[in-house]
């Protein structure tokens, strides 16, 4: 159920999107109060259930309905359930749901106010639309890995930004529908989202402007301390931060250099900074550099963040009681009037809410019993 006192209270989202971007979108919407119903396949559910850490991180707070869309009665039940929604979100290959009778044009006939959001790799049209890909390929094609020494990134940026823009599409559509009474069709391509967030790199190139030098300052980098702890300096271009750093590191000859002059001498200055920082432990630099108001910080581990007082004060980690014991999650990042809206329930078991929600949607008891039977007859299994 939705949370009436939260920003998205009263909005129901039915999701047919699996794995990463769709579930990340509905996680954000759910934390902000939307009632999220996840449609899963009865055998195995969302494939990400095979990866417990991933599934738990993305799927708390939702209700699970297991339906085999190849079964005519299950397909009809799915359409009925979608009829109770404000937003439907899907992540199938382009055209698949249309062939099943669950495309935007078909569902809009039932409910003209329905907001329909499709998230896919390359969008619903274009020469790449049917290309299979995961996050690394999206980043490569979008130019994000165009560096002297390309490396596999640690974060799935296409999945993350795809999810965020999918949530943005859902909220945009719901807001528009409330004012106009009509929904709409929102086509989110993960590839497009990466081009959008790479605008500061791509727009200068498109307009034959000089490339920016942000990140080339010798005061922008990672440095090892005497005790092996790594720390970061992020002086992007500011001369006053550089002057403060030179005072803290006893580098008077470099104190008055401009950003352009520093970049010209980047290698030598970077080496000088590294040499000085390596001479003292991290605790020393916490006091000296952070104390001087220089953009500085340690490289935190997951354990560091779990114990961080700032993170605790902002209530970013929230623990809730579940049938499987207490579980800890990271909330969506917005504080709304000082309230840290977060998860209201844990991760659902596969099909846990099928009977409840189909019955509430008015589906005949005999049909509900038949659709639930495969779940009740199977061997009980853990969430994942």
Residue spans for each PLM region:
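Short Gly/Pro-enriched turn/cap motifs at secondary-structure boundaries
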Residues: 209-215, 221-222, 324-327, 346-349
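Short linear loop/turn motifs
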Residues: 256-270, 300-307, 324, 366-384
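Glycine-rich beta-alpha junction loops
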Residues: 43, 121-123, 190-195, 227-229, ...
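A glycine-rich dinucleotide-binding beta-alpha-beta segment and adjacent secondary-structure elements
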Residues: 291-344
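A short glycine-threonine-serine/GTX helix/turn-capping micro-motif
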Residues: 151-161, 185, 214-220, 231-232, ...
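Aromatic-enriched alpha-helical interface/lid elements that frame and gate functional surfaces
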Residues: 219-292, 296
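N-terminal helix-loop segment corresponding to the beta1-alpha1 unit
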Residues: 1-182, 205-206, 320, 349, ...
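Substrate-binding/catalytic subdomain of NAD(P)-dependent oxidoreductase enzymes
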Residues: 173-210
